[in-house]
């Protein structure tokens, strides 16, 4: 369906020159003098190439409808990441460039939302929080607990983050998948 360029948002899928693109960033620019434009940065779904386009805000762009479904993460192999539809038990292979940096937070049997166009995976949305174990961090030195500073820690998925001084090696913590920041100590 055709929409005006100024209505395109991050996460939308658009078709251009017969190819599908996921919008990475979309910004409407209104210069003091001249025509307002929409600056859109997008990633081609077929091969992951990023391009940047500039449209007049009134230009027509072909927006593609996508379907969002829950899938269960199974495993990773050299081809990509394998997910299963829990209702139909159909498996789908998601390329590594679609998952991107979120791959570090994928855990076996985790439920994620996959956005699909026909049968092609377009994007993935992980749960906001995951529970991970601290595998390496500095020991607490006496008198250091008075300040509210964070100390560096390495998690079981290899990601580095900052944790409060009372967190030790072996402690399970909850982190935000968006930026890897510490949220709280796990309650389990």
UniProtKB/Swiss-Prot annotation:
The keyword Cytoplasm appears for this protein: yes
- SUPFAM superfamilies the UniProt entry points to: Nucleic acid-binding proteins, Translation proteins SH3-like domain
Instruction: Tell me which InterPro entries the record gives.
Output: Elong-fact-P_C, NA-bd_OB-fold, Rib_uL2_dom2, Transl_elong_fac_P/YeiP, Transl_elong_KOW-like, Transl_elong_P/YeiP_cen, Transl_elong_P/YeiP_CS, Transl_elongation_fac_P
Q: Name one GO cellular component term.
A: cytoplasm
Q: Which UniProt keywords apply?
A: Cytoplasm, Elongation factor, Protein biosynthesis
Tell me which domain of life the UniProt entry assigns to the organism this sequence originates from: Bacteria
Please give the pathway this protein is involved in.
Protein biosynthesis; polypeptide chain elongation
CDD domains for the chain: S1_EF-P_repeat_1, S1_EF-P_repeat_2
GO BP terms? peptide biosynthetic process
Q: Where in the cell is it found?
A: Cytoplasm
Task: Name the protein family.
Answer: Belongs to the elongation factor P family.
Function statement: Involved in peptide bond synthesis. Stimulates efficient translation and peptide-bond synthesis on native or reconstituted 70S ribosomes in vitro. Probably functions indirectly by altering the affinity of the ribosome for aminoacyl-tRNA, thus increasing their reactivity as acceptors for peptidyl transferase.
Query: What name is this protein filed under?
Result: Elongation factor P
Q: Which organism is it from?
A: Bradyrhizobium sp. (strain BTAi1 / ATCC BAA-1182)
